[in-house]
Amino acid sequence: MSHSRFKSAKSAMRKLKTEQRKFGDRVSQHTSPRVNRWFKWMAPGLFVKRWMVISAVGLTLMFLGLAIWVKLTPIFRITEFVSDTLGFLTNLLPNYVSGPLILALGLFFVFWGQSRTVGSISEVLQPDNDQELVDVLLAHRRLNKGAKIVVVGGGTGLSTLLRGLKHYSANITAIVTVADDGGSSGRLRREMGMLPPGDIRNCIGALADEEKLLTELFQYRFKAGDGLSGHSFGNLFLTAMAEITGDLEMAAIACSKVLAVRGKVLPATLDDVKLWAEMEDGRYVEGESNIPEAQGRIRRIGCLPESPKALPAVLKAIKAADYIIIGPGSLYTSILPNLLIPEIQTAIAKAKVPRIYICNVMTQPGETDNYTVSDHLTAIDQVSSARLYDAVLVQRNPPSAPVLKKYAAENSHPVYLDRQAVIEKGCRIVLANVMQEDEKSHQVRHDPQRLARVLMRWYGGQ
């Protein structure tokens, strides 16, 4: 099949799915909740109807076998009874009335019996969940058929993106940096030789079904206690799990299973990575937390060891990916640490799937002062000899005046889109409003739902 025919087929499938969704919405609007539930059970792809039919066939065969076993007498009696009943009904009512009436009655009993059976089961499986079992099944099937998405990054930007993406696919692999050496993660790294769990903790919380409660629990920091003060519960939980399972990779996988996480969260490497940066004024700064505090323009960034070994599961996920997303997050301390791993660079460069970089909305003091969009792309190009992106997603409209004023006081400004310089790099530009403002704090962040919607729309058009 040619590329144009393939795109036409994809377009036709998208239109069909859209029409199916619209029909479903119309049915939902004009039917009662109970009838609407029955319609949902008839939806394709649930793997329920086929087993109901097989059960009915099996039950019929059981009665037939029993009848044969007892020398066919029951079949004769049943046939005679059915014949007399049908004769009575056709004498009482015309066949074009009695036939559909009995058919409808039979269907009613089938649906009623099955719905009560499922209801009894769901009361046990989901005693405190208001969501219908059929809705859970529909969502499960839809998400499991979603695209295989690999997201590379770290920090709050990555967890923000995952909150939106998890509504489009359950086949998400988040590749997370392990270069953090500040705060609770840094203490665990120094005192216990533990790889920093902070970013992994945030991503697991973002992908969980009970996201709000789990995030609050994982973010909870102990305020007192020898050795506990300043540590977050999530970091200690992951540390304990790593002690039990043997390493951070197995700890992340185990936590994901325990907490019903959609997708996987993997550390980029299990090596003890330490970042370093060479500033334009000649200074050499070592340590992830020290780089932004150096308050200078970064000329070059690297890590020790020079060539960390990538996790095999990470390389496998990139190879199997349908879609690769880089960012958002701190350019030098959250995104590039992953791309400094040679095997990850090579795997992304070889990928023949759509690859997009999400540019930050604002510049970051100490890391990307006065950076344009093309400067972000140049920084990525400097750590890799091959192209790692096909497009860049840029916020369309600037923040409001109060937000700009607040950020300007911190020496932070909107990232300027130097369109021509980006085009000269052979990079496509995706402009969209993916930002949200906090009216109280005047902070800007990527909006999880808008961001995910724009990214999946762009992917669908490739």
Curated annotation (Swiss-Prot):
Organism: Synechocystis sp. (strain ATCC 27184 / PCC 6803 / Kazusa)
HAMAP family in UniProt: Gluconeogen_factor
Origin: domain of life: Bacteria
GO biological process annotation, one example: regulation of cell shape
Keywords on record: Cytoplasm
CDD domains, alphabetized: YvcK_like (cd07187)
Family the entry assigns: Belongs to the gluconeogenesis factor family.
GO cellular component: cytoplasm
TM stretches of this protein: none
Function recorded in the entry: Required for morphogenesis under gluconeogenic growth conditions.
GO MF term set: LPPG:FO 2-phospho-L-lactate transferase activity
Basic residues composition bias: residue spans: 1-15
Subcellular location: Cytoplasm
Protein name in UniProt: Putative gluconeogenesis factor
UniProt keyword Cell cycle present: no
Region named Disordered: 1-21
